[in-house]
């Protein structure tokens, strides 16, 4: 969240207000109903409706239909209970923080006292949670590497200097690392009356000690006007209103604007910190299909939003749990990590199927399952023409499979 005020009192009031906004994610990714003509393994062609993820054309079909065309038994049920002390497995709880303080008079919910952060980390260790590095998280998500049970990734947003002065010593004390998502323009062009932000030199020092710094846009961390009435939405995920021409920007203008911003942020992070990989946290947790496509085009595979849930390989756009609220005691902050329901698992012919895309979901009383993931798990090749809606399934030959 960007803060640009002339009086400290107003500055911290604005922190409170913007913290309230930042924890409300805005998502603009959706499924569109589409007509399909599917030729199954038995050669029979069936006409049906399905849902397609608009960004990548992943198909979600009725489970009963999938069983018919694939000639397989498909299950979608809760995983067996885990042993005592293990709260989740093969998932990562990504925790989100923003600003720390050691000022006892700074009593705003979204600004966490440093002592409270220290207590949280101590309890994480005591309660059997395992803080992992960004490298471990990346390998887990992209290379199917294992992570410990009760794995946790610590992340911060906005690049406040309190990360260097307060969080960094506490992290080192516990032997932990963390990621900070930087509003890069705030580092390149510091604003005098803004809450202090990190410098490149501070980040270089911390990077040598294992901390990581990634993209929170160059200069799109703001709400911008999207209509003639002055309504606003997050600038990174909305078609902005052009006053002089009384219109919203076109898709190609949006792509050019946002691609240019994110690419510039990536370049600066590489130039100053030597980054060789990428990740992004979306401002305000807001994203849409176009923004996801832009990130993919720039090689930014790992993405983070805001939401209560665990990170898994089913999506590279992971939710993050807000642990940076001072009203949440350390004990309660840890307790909420223990409350996640056992994950649902997809099985094919009684065999657990790893997912690297959208999970099944219940819609209008029917279970929708990801057809491409099922085909991959069964060694079936799926040919899908999104323009015509024609799908053809053929077994992968042993030679091709081997």
Q: What does each model-found stretch correspond to?
A:
Residues 2-86, 90, 95, 332-402:
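Primary recognition of N-terminal secretory signal peptides and signal-anchoring hydrophobic helices
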Residues 40, 71-152, 316, 320-347:
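N-terminal pre-catalytic segment of deacetylase/amide-hydrolase enzymes
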Residues 56-61, 111-115, 161-162, 197, ...:
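Soluble non-cytosolic domains of exported or imported proteins
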Residues 64, 68, 115-122, 126, ...:
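Solvent-exposed, polar/charged alpha-helical surfaces in well-ordered, non-transmembrane soluble domains
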Residues 86-90, 145-148, 172-175, 205-208, ...:
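Extracellular/periplasmic catalytic domains that process cell-envelope and extracellular macromolecules
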Residues 288-330:
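Extended hydrophobic/aromatic segments used for targeting, binding, or gating
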């Amino acid at each position: 969240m960007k803060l640009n005020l002339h009086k400290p009192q107003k500055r911290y009031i604005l922190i409170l207000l913007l913290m309230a906004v930042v924890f409300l994610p805005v998502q603009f990714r959706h499924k569109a109903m589409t007509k399909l003509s599917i030729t199954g393994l038995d050669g029979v062609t069936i006409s049906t409706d399905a849902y397609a993820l608009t960004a990548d054309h992943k198909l979600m079909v009725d489970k009963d239909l999938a069983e018919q065309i694939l000639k397989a038994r498909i299950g979608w049920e809760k995983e067996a209970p885990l042993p005592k002390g293990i709260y989740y497995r093969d998932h990562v709880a990504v925790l989100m923080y923003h600003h720390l303080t050691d000022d006892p008079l700074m009593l705003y919910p979204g600004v966490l006292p440093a002592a409270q952060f220290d207590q949280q980390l101590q309890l994480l260790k005591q309660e059997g949670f395992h803080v992992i590095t960004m490298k471990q998280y990346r390998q887990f998500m992209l290379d199917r590497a294992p992570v410990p049970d009760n794995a946790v990734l610590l992340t911060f947003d906005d690049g406040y200097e309190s990360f260097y002065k307060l969080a960094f010593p506490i992290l080192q004390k516990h032997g932990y690392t963390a990621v900070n998502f930087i509003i890069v323009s705030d580092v390149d062009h510091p604003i005098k009356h803004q809450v202090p932000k990190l410098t490149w030199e501070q980040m270089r020092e911390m990077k040598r000690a294992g901390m990581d710094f990634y993209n929170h846009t160059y200069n799109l961390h703001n709400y911008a006007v999207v209509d003639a009435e002055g309504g606003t939405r997050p600038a990174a995920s909305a078609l902005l209103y052009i006053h002089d021409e009384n219109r919203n920007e076109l898709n190609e203008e949006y792509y050019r604007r946002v691609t240019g911003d994110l690419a510039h942020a990536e370049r600066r992070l590489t130039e100053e910190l030597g980054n060789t990989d990428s990740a992004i946290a979306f401002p305000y947790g807001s994203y849409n299909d176009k923004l996801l496509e832009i990130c993919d085009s720039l090689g930014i595979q790992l993405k983070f939003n805001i939401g209560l849930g665990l990170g898994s390989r089913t999506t590279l756009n992971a939710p993050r749990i807000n642990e940076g609220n001072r009203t949440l005691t350390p004990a309660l902050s840890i307790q909420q990590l223990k409350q996640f329901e056992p994950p649902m698992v997809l099985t094919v012919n009684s065999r657990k199927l790893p997912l690297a895309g959208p999970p099944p979901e219940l819609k209008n009383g029917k279970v929708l399952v990801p057809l491409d993931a099922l085909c991959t798990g069964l060694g079936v090749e799926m040919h899908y023409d999104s323009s015509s809606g024609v799908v053809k399934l053929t077994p992968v030959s042993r030679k091709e499979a081997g």
